[in-house]
Amino acid sequence: MGRGPPAVLAPWMLFLSLAQANFAPHFFDNGAGSTNGNMALFSLPEDTPVGSHVYTLNGTDPEGDPVSYHISFNPSARSVFSVDPNLGNITLIEELDREREDEIEAIISISDGLNLVAEKVTILVTDANDEAPRFIQEPYVVQVPEDTPSGSSIARVRAVDRDTGSAGSVTYFLKNPHPTEFSVDRHSGVLRLRAGAILDFEKARAHFVTVVAKDGGGKLRGADVVLSATTVVTVNVEDVQDMGPVFVGTPYYGYVYEDTLPGSEVLMVVAMDGDRGKPNRVLYSLVNGSDGAFEINETSGAISVMQSPSQLRREVYELHVQVTEVSSAGTPAAQAMVPVTIRIVDLNNHPPTFYGESGPQNRFELSMYEHPPQGEILRGLKITVNDSDQGANAKFNLRLVGPGGIFRVVPQTVLNEAQVTIIVENSAAIDFEKSKVLTFKLLAIEVNTPEKFSSTADVVIQLLDTNDNVPKFTSHYYVARIPENAPGGSNVLAVTAVDPDSGPWGEVKYSIYGSGADLFLIHPSSGIIYTQPWASLDAEATARYNFYVKAEDMEGRYSLAEVFITLLDVNDHYPQFGKSVQEKTMVLGTPVKIEATDQDAEEPNNLVDYSITHAEPANVFDINAHTGEIWLKNSIRSLDALHNITPSGDRTWSLEVQAKDRGSPSFSTTALLKIDIVDTEMLSRSPMAAFLMQTKDNPMKAVGVLAGIMAIIVAITVLISTATFWRNKKSNKVQPVRRVLRKRPSPAPRSVRIEWLKFRRTKAADKFVLREAPPNENCNNNSRGSTPAPQAPAPPPPPSPAPSVGQAPWTVPTVSGSLAPQQPQQPSPKPRAVAKRKAVGSPVQSALVSELRQKFEKKNLHSKAYF
């Protein structure tokens, strides 16, 4: 009994003891972020490439036996990983997709050959930006009435991105922008008609707008990528609607930002009739949920906020929009309802706002006179602009949009608030006659904000007229032609002047003036020029009149035009023969000429034709109808042939000639002409007879010849008399009348005087030179044209030392001889005696004595000699 177990049990007991000593292997738990261990809290990006070594299973056996690794999945799941049983390296064998499978469940096991330890692990698949935005509710087809107001919301596109974070946020823009038609809200995807855009069903029944949805970007395979998607919004322009309304693009979401102004559009709901053939129009209305904060445009479905965002009490508004069809008869039809969610978004941004005296205002009007002074301020405009933001967000620029260069705005840059001043830049462009209304837009646009919010206000200036224009004639000159026989008071022409000013300033009064205006009058209002009632016009006296017409407004501003009036000649004068036509003398073989004049001013009224109306006999003379020359017929070549024509053998013939003008009606005058016919032989025998015969036709010719002969005789007489007068005057100048030369008191003999003159000839000659031309003296006292030189009282004659008998008291000794005393006037000698006396003396000696005498007299006058 005290012995051990039986021997047969010993091997089994040994085996059991050995089995109990072999412990199971286990994994190492290295925690999150480790790439080896038991895959606890292991995550893997979904963009990991297939075949990548992503993890290493790591474990151990307490006995140090080698271990092997295994991984398995649910039968319904994919086998995503494979493992190296010896090394434990896990390799990705299938692509991951977080959006399809964001976690993977697997069973990993470790075995030492005897023991197998298995664990269930969950591998998290992390996001990568591998999903592009995807539009939902495609296709986008919008039915828009062609009368939809510009700026209205017409559709909303919506795209979702299954990525997370910024890679899942979506913004919208137009790929092919339509700057004149559509725009899209970058946050909400609301598609709107641009301001000023108009849809026209007849021009385009459909518009295709490409909208791009772009995510916020993220990592994909180690690189930053931004993915996008596009969709096409088909905007069908509707003409009519008639089926039950159906909302398009539900659900509806809208956003009201802090800077949204009351009356701004938030979003637009769209409903259309299912009957596209001839649809009825629909009307929108808000059923409940707005609390007076929102209104909907009953025709476009545009929902607008009516209160300032600061006055809104809730963050989210759930509105119910009802659409009602209206039949062609105007009665309500089918209805539909849709919920609309509007969220209030808090942003610190306000657009600039214009204020008038009574509050916010977007239209300002002013009346002012045209052409104000340059630099004048438009004080009638009270405009204030304000931006409620702070700092850089409240800085904006001001400018005027409209016809350039007329006005400028001050200031041009504003921070928060400013008083707007508009100043005149171009006074000439502010013209009532060019434009009665000037319209500008005052634009305020932010400077440093990405949104560039702006606002506009209309500035309308009504111009008032002033008298700034001068009446202007339609032409600088006017030309008129009237017949000279026009009666008094006849209309001549009408002048027209236009004054573009309005009212009384535009009324024009006419007047005429000038040297040629005496015979004319002008109507002060109509500008009609007519002749004076008493005027008698005569083209022969004055054929042309020229004067000025004046157009003047009520304040005296005027302009001038020149008027030229030409009188048209009328045949109102008879041809008139001269007096010499009554009798003519014809030399055989030479024609005689008659001449008549017509006082009319113009041709053909003053052109005269000549004819012989009566002659006895009628076959003797011919006449040139144009020149009036009369000659004997070619058959009559001698006086004998002429005498044989009549029994009496007359040499004097009587003709009745006629002068007739070419006017219409024509006037004529007749005259009786006597022609004396002589032969050339008779004239050659007696020149005086020839002359008298020639002057018989023209007595004034003889008078002219006699007057010419008398004129020649008179001219010769005057020429001889003038020559004689100047010769006597020159000779008498050297013999002054009643002048006595007083001798010097020096007792020097005359011989000394002569020697002094002889040896100092050069110096004495200088003294004889006359420094200043003396006036002509009246030596003969026979001319009243010259004034005699002043004379001193005549002193007694100086005593003469022993005058010799017969010596003349007026003798003056000279170098070459003595001067003869002046002889008293005696009766004029006969020409022969004068010639004999002139021949006595030498001409050379007489000339020399005369010259020395003249020089001596000038010398004595220069030395102030006593007389």
Swiss-Prot record:
UniProt KW Transmembrane keyword: yes
Cytoplasmic compartment residues: 723-867
Entry PTM: Undergoes proteolytic cleavage; produces a soluble 95 kDa N-terminal fragment and a 25 kDa cell-associated C-terminal fragment.
GO cellular component: adherens junction; catenin complex
Domain Cadherin: 36-135, 136-247, 248-354, 360-473, 474-577, 574-689
Membrane-crossing segments per the record: 702-722
UniProt membrane topology term: Single-pass membrane protein
Compartment(s): Cell membrane
Key word Membrane present: yes
Signal peptide positions on this chain: 1-21
Span list, region Disordered: 767-843
MF terms in GO: beta-catenin binding; cadherin binding; calcium ion binding
Single GO biological process annotation from the record: calcium-dependent cell-cell adhesion via plasma membrane cell adhesion molecules
Superkingdom per UniProt: Eukaryota
Polar residues compositional bias, start-end: 777-786
Entry comment describing in which tissues the protein is expressed: Expressed in photoreceptor cells of the outer nuclear layer of the retina.
Residue spans of biased composition, Pro residues class: 790-802
Positions in the Extracellular compartment: 22-701
Pfam families: Cadherin (PF00028)
Residues carrying covalently attached carbohydrate according to the record: N58, N89, N288, N297
InterPro entries referenced in this protein's UniProt entry, alphabetically: Cadherin, Cadherin-like_dom, Cadherin-like_sf, Cadherin_CS
Subunit-structure text: Interacts with PROM1.
Described function: Potential calcium-dependent cell-adhesion protein. May be required for the structural integrity of the outer segment (OS) of photoreceptor cells.
UniProt-recorded name of the protein: Cadherin-related family member 1
Organism: Bos taurus (Bovine)
Name of the gene: CDHR1
